[in-house]
Amino acid sequence: MQENQQITKKEQYNLNKLQKRLRRNVGEAIADFNMIEEGDRIMVCLSGGKDSYTMLEILRNLQQSAPINFSLVAVNLDQKQPGFPEHVLPEYLEKLGVEYKIVEENTYGIVKEKIPEGKTTCSLCSRLRRGILYRTATELGATKIALGHHRDDILQTLFLNMFYGGKMKGMPPKLMSDDGKHIVIRPLAYCREKDIQRFADAKAFPIIPCNLCGSQPNLQRQVIADMLRDWDKRYPGRIETMFSAMQNVVPSHLCDTNLFDFKGITHGSEVVNGGDLAFDREEIPLQPACWQPEEDENQLDELRLNVVEVK
């Protein structure tokens, strides 16, 4: 009995610590990009995956202590995929007491009709889904649309565009929608996917898999995701450093003439951002920028539990 109590305390301690980190990450992103303002009505797009469940949970948590007032309405798009468990999300949201709307649109049928067997469905599916969500936001009077993309998604998009699109373009934490009528926010922009996964596992969210894209092998995004996970294991801190680089762009030291007036550089021009250091010896720090070793949570847990036992 005592052992079971210790396990429960350990799990609760880890969950509390993890939730605080996620809450801090979301709070910082909201503040840095002014994502949520007084009186906002946030349409939280809920797919049934770990990311959107976590986003809703953290936003609900922040709502209780935020210095501003804002409301949440969860929206799920039922795309009429075969075997989609229609009861799961309504039951979950009613239990939470969260306002919600289920939008039923047979985008699955459209995708299957338009896309040849074996081809990637993501692009068409995303466009259809986007249009429906924009329309729903208008109907609900939502001032912001919240999507569940996290830090890893943002980095993956950056590399996808570099490797396959030939451009430095990521996934912005806040943007104007394609139709120019809605503001889209990504509150999980600073959150690590592995933290979200651990949180979702601990909370035992009723996950609904995507039968359209989740079962498609060899997607380019999956290749990039595997590469980043490998780097994260072999080179601790590299992911943090790359994300930090996205927040510290130096246009004068790239090659885009739209971002910097290279033609305007003449004799007598000011030195910009340190000038050219190409011939200087590079001073590389021993540890990547913005990296901190992860806490040994097992040791912390054991220490805390031992203190509890002594008392």
UniProtKB/Swiss-Prot annotation:
Q: What is its EC number?
A: 2.8.1.-
Matches recorded under SUPFAM superfamilies: Adenine nucleotide alpha hydrolases-like
Outcome of swapping residue 210 to A: Able to functionally complement a ttcA deletion mutant, although less efficiently than wild-type
GO MF terms on file? 4 iron, 4 sulfur cluster binding; ATP binding; magnesium ion binding; protein homodimerization activity; sulfurtransferase activity; tRNA binding
UniProtKB keywords: 4Fe-4S, ATP-binding, Cytoplasm, Iron, Iron-sulfur, Magnesium, Metal-binding, Nucleotide-binding, RNA-binding, Transferase, tRNA processing, tRNA-binding
State how the cofactor is bound: Binds 1 [4Fe-4S] cluster per subunit. The cluster is chelated by three Cys residues, the fourth Fe has a free coordination site that may bind a sulfur atom transferred from the persulfide of IscS. The [4Fe-4S] cluster is highly sensitive to oxygen and prone to decompose into the [2Fe-2S] form and further degraded forms.
Q: Indicate the principal place this protein occupies in or around the cell.
A: cytoplasm
Functional pathway: tRNA modification
Its annotated compartments are: Cytoplasm
Q: Which reaction does it catalyse?
A: cytidine(32) in tRNA + S-sulfanyl-L-cysteinyl-[cysteine desulfurase] + AH2 + ATP = 2-thiocytidine(32) in tRNA + L-cysteinyl-[cysteine desulfurase] + A + AMP + diphosphate + H(+)
Which residue ranges traverse the bilayer?
Answer: none
Residue window of motif PP-loop motif: 47-52
Q: What happens when the gene is disrupted?
A: Loss of cytidine thiolation in position 32 in tRNA.
Binding-site positions, [4Fe-4S] cluster? 122, 125, 213
Q: Which Gene3D superfamilies match?
A: HUPs (3.40.50.620)
Q: Which domain of life is it from?
A: Bacteria
Additional remark text: The thiolation reaction likely consists of two steps: a first activation step by ATP to form an adenylated intermediate of the target base of tRNA, and a second nucleophilic substitution step of the sulfur (S) atom supplied by the hydrosulfide attached to the Fe-S cluster.
Q: Which NCBIfam families does the entry link to? A: PRK10696.1
Similarity section: Belongs to the TtcA family.
Q: What is this protein called?
A: tRNA-cytidine(32) 2-sulfurtransferase
